[in-house]
C-alpha cells in the first residue's frame, strides 16, 4: 500500500502553488517525514532542453520555488540539478527559470559531470553509471513534469531519474539497452530504485499532450501529486489522463520487477478525492522506435 497525495492547482501563480504544495505535503505527514532538519537536498528537475517555462517542456519554476521554500523552512540546504543530453544544466538553468529561483530563495545550481557505478549487482544492468554528484546529498526530491513521450508513452517520475545519468553518457545507455522498450524500461526502473528519491512531486498544473516530450501542446490539467513511491504516483497520472497502465513501459516493468505499487486498488489517496478530477480527451502521442 502506497500513499499518493493529489490536490488541485489551476495556475502557476506562486501564492496558489505554495498553498497547494503545503496542502499536498501536509496530507502526507509534512516535509519532516521525508528529510531530516538541516539536510542537503537535491531537487531533481526536468530540463530536457533550455526552454522557457511557458513551453511546458521543463518542470515549472513555481513548483521548484515552492518546494525549495518548504525545505528552507526546515533549515535544509537546497540544490537544483539535472543533466540534459546536450549542454550543461547551469547553462540552461536561466532559460527555464531555475537560476532565478536559486538566486531568489538561496539555492545552488549543480551540474552532473562525473559518473559512478550504481550499486545494482542483482539487477539486469549491473554496471549502470549515474552522476557521482548525487552522492553529495542526504536526500533527493524528484520533480517531474507530466508530458507525453514519443518513445515511452509518458515521461513521469520514474523516467525523470534518467536525468541522473551524465548527459554525455545517455546515448551510450540508450544504445546498451537497445530498441526493446521493455528492456529499456527495466533500466529506467533500476536507476529509479537504485537512487531512491525520498519524494516525487509531479507538476501537472499544465502538462504536455500530443507530440511530447518537446514539441507537444501545453494542456491544462490542474493537478499536483506527491508520493514517496514514484511508481504509484505515475500509475495515478496514467489513470488521470486515461492511459492504460499496462501499455506504459515503465509501469509494466516496475510491476514485473516488484518495485513500487502496481495496482490502483493498493493506493491510499490523500489530499483530495481522485474522483474529483476529470481530465478528458488528453491527446496521446504515436509511439516511435528507440532507434537513433
Language-model features and meaning:
Residues 1-292:
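N-terminal and secondary-structure boundary signal
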Amino acid at each position: 500500500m502506497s500513499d499518493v497525495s493529489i490536490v488541485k492547482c489551476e495556475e502557476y501563480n506562486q501564492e496558489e502553488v505554495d498553498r497547494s504544495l503545503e496542502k499536498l505535503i501536509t496530507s502526507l505527514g509534512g516535509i519532516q517525514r521525508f528529510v531530516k532538519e538541516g539536510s542537503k537536498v537535491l531537487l531533481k528537475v526536468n530540463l530536457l532542453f533550455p526552454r522557457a517555462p511557458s513551453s511546458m517542456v521543463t518542470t515549472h519554476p513555481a513548483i521548484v520555488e515552492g518546494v525549495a521554500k518548504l525545505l528552507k523552512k526546515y533549515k535544509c540546504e537546497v540544490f537544483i540539478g539535472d543533466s540534459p543530453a546536450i549542454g550543461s544544466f547551469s547553462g540552461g538553468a536561466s532559460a527555464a527559470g531555475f537560476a532565478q529561483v536559486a538566486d531568489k530563495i538561496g539555492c545552488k545550481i549543480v551540474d552532473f559531470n562525473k559518473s559512478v557505478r550504481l550499486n545494482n549487482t542483482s539487477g539486469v544492468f549491473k554496471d549502470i553509471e549515474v552522476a557521482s554528484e548525487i552522492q553529495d546529498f542526504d536526500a533527493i526530491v524528484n520533480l517531474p513534469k507530466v508530458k507525453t513521450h514519443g518513445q515511452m508513452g509518458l515521461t513521469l517520475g520514474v523516467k525523470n531519474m534518467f536525468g541522473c545519468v551524465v548527459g554525455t553518457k545517455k546515448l551510450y545507455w540508450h544504445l546498451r539497452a537497445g530498441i526493446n522498450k521493455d528492456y529499456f524500461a527495466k533500466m529506467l526502473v533500476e536507476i529509479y530504485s537504485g537512487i531512491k528519491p525520498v519524494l516525487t512531486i509531479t507538476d501537472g498544473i499544465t502538462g504536455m499532450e500530443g507530440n511530447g516530450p518537446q514539441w507537444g501542446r501545453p494542456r491544462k490539467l490542474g493537478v499536483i501529486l506527491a508520493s514517496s513511491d514514484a511508481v504509484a504516483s505515475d500509475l495515478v497520472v496514467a489513470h488521470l489522463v486515461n492511459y492504460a497502465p499496462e501499455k506504459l513501459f515503465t509501469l509494466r516493468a516496475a510491476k514485473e520487477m516488484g518495485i513500487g505499487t502496481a495496482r490502483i486498488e493498493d493506493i491510499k489517496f490523500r489530499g483530495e478525492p481522485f474522483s474529483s478530477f476529470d481530465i478528458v480527451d488528453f491527446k496521446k502521442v504515436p509511439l516511435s522506435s528507440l532507434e537513433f
